[in-house]
Amino acid sequence: MCRIRTFRLRRKRRVSGRSFCRSRIDPGYVRERPYIGGRSRPTTFHLTRKKKAPLGGDLSPSFARSPVLEPSSPPQALSVPSLSSEKKTASPTCVKHHLSGGAVRRANTVVPRTKKRTSRHHTLMSTTCRCWSSSIVLYEHLDARVSDVGKTSRRRRCSLGGTLSGSIISIVAKRDCDYDEPHHLFFMLLLYKRLMSTTLGISHLVKHARFSSLQGTLGSLKGTVYRPKQKTHTCNRSTTSNDTKTQSYNALFMERTWNKKTIAARAKPKPSGEAGASFPTQSLGSLSSFFFPDSLKNHRHSPMTRNQLLEHKRSQQVETNKLDDAITLYCVYIDRCEFVGKKRRCMMHNDRETGDCSSLPNANTQTHRFPSPHKEMRPPPTNEADSCSSYDGALARRASSPLREGTSGSSAHRPKQQCLLHCHQSISCILFPPNSSPQHQFALLRKVVATAAAATGRSSSPRPQTLYMCRKCVNTCYCPMRLVHRYMFQNLLIHLRAHRLGVSSSSNWPTFSTTVVNPCTTTPIKTTSSSSPRPRNDTRSPPILGMCF
């Protein structure tokens, strides 16, 4: 078994590297065979005694050649919640090649001597580097003030690498990455949370020119909240112009506090033909306001000294702690789908303490889990003629006879599509404290996304969809919304804003061209919720707002 490691040099076609092969005679020796010029040449093999790797990683010359990372001490790994059930440790070899930007090839790749080396040999093969497939590891080099985060999805062969130097973070995608996927969004959120709590903060995004998915996702998340004067790319197309990239990045910087003049100037209503025209969005905040706090705007382009960096780190830690103390994640329950033979069955995770979010007495209630009221409901139909009334019979039967744990119910009560939720799809229910600001609501949504994406990232479905449902609307009618993941924050905040204004949103759901939304126009039905249904003419603002999605 031979592990070949090559490093591509920029603006050069020559490939320099070494091939290390274990000797079958003595496992303590290593055959060293250098090759130059992009093709193998017959050379003399030198048997050298294999050196033991130092504690913390193999600091070979290839690792030391990194232009940014030159630590005086071995890197220290900080454990981060794993994305899968099985725990794996990061291999120093994988860490070295991932941080140095080198390409890893398959072990059984044979390079012909007669043909010229092609680009397919330099492709990053994520199956070789297992250390990034199941966990996210953060390496901090205190001397160089550089932190690196890497993650690879083995199933999608997507490699993400992040580098923080000073107050600049770089997120680079080396293979086909879809930032609309929940586990990729989870990587971004975890990266933000880790950097804001352990390092210096974020003031600018620097992204690879070939991949603009991150830029398109953030542009879509902004939605109608912020409209820059210059056009930005909101699609997943490659961006090659530096001017366009700079304009897009500048559009992400927002003021954290919105005064009345700014709100009045930027809150321009949409035309009547566009979606979401009846919902004001002036106080919904912005995603970039949380990614880029105003405390970093003075240091956006000016370098900071070490004392300034440490002071900023301490101040940012205080802000993060205050935000975490003010917001609490209340209810989280998970519907899981497992494959039993060729059939899929839904498993329910029940606890002794069950209930409903609306039955919580106050905002300081401890976190608990409860059964799902919309456990096996079908997705909304694509035909607009088919409304929510078609679900009444199935929902009423399911509400009267709850399903047992580990089963899908009888065949008579089972819909055509057994599981609305895909495998390991997380459904989170959150409650907002009374009179909570939009910024706090947004931060709470961000926490729930990280929780949901941690389970969704292990899904075996090709493209897991997310179910969005307002908890207040459950008492009147089931209004599921299967939306594209990027519209998540905008739609939920618009819907909550409508609740706070007393708008009957059961028939005024925001619609988008890329979503399938069916407004509920039927009469209220009884559900498994413990609270009584709210009448449609009740326009009072509820004391606690909540949602399940």
Curated annotation (Swiss-Prot):
> Compositional bias of type Polar residues: which residue ranges?
75-84, 356-369
Record keywords: DNA-binding, Phosphoprotein
Asked whether the keyword DNA-binding is assigned, the reply is: yes
Where are the stretches annotated Disordered?
A: 50-92, 353-391, 523-542
Biased composition (Low complexity) is annotated at 523-534
The record's GO molecular-function terms, alphabetically, read:
DNA binding
Q: What else is known?
A: The tegument is a granular zone surrounding the capsid.
**UniProt function note:** This viral structural protein may have important functions, such as protein kinase activity, DNA binding, and possible transcriptional activation of immediate-early genes.
* Name by which UniProt lists this protein: Tegument protein
This protein's species is: Human cytomegalovirus
